[in-house]
Amino acid sequence: MTSPMTSPVSGPVVREPASAMTRFSAMEALAAQLSDELVVLSLGGAVDEWYTAAPHLREASLFQQQLGCVTPQALGLAAGLPHRRVVSLDTDGGLLFNLGVLATLGNERPGNLLVVVWDNERYQSIGGPRTHTSSGTVDLAAIARGAGVVHASTVRDVGSFAAACAAGLADTAAPHVVVAKVDTSPEGHAAAGHPVVRRKHSDGREDTYRFVRHVEATEGVMIMGPSEHN
């Protein structure tokens, strides 16, 4: 995750949150449940991990680069394609940057949207300063429920995570928010025996075109027409 515009919680860098699951293992469990869904995900380490864990969803994944925009953009896709399942892979820092989107989810209740929040309790990409969720007081799932998202839960192991995602993908009546407490440290990744994470060899512009062309092909619509200058 990248730094927010305001300073993160002060204090020394802390250990990873107590969790029996790495983010990569959770990604593998989720990827196994997805086929033709559209995925919007955050910037930072999650990008390369998803690129490695879900190669079959490469064209269907939009790698977002603005903090606080992942779930709002996924919500827009869900509204525009109500017959299509959309998955938001957000982060604790990203969601904290735009908590207002939870109120919109609570009011609009898009039944085709699953929101996963990777909560490692830190801004990892700038060295690991803590986010507000590390205090033990700030509960993103509780905030979501308070905003009207009835199906919002926090999970700490792969089995519970997979079950919560399966429930969200099967429910067509309301959105689900799954806050996954994860270990994103290199040590945890190595200890779990995960493969080496491959770097994504494309930039944001190429990713956008790939994603749009995928939506066009699978939906039979034109979103970005031919350029008049070609």
What are these regions (language model features)?
Residues 12-17:
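A detector for short, charged/polar N-terminal pre-domain segments
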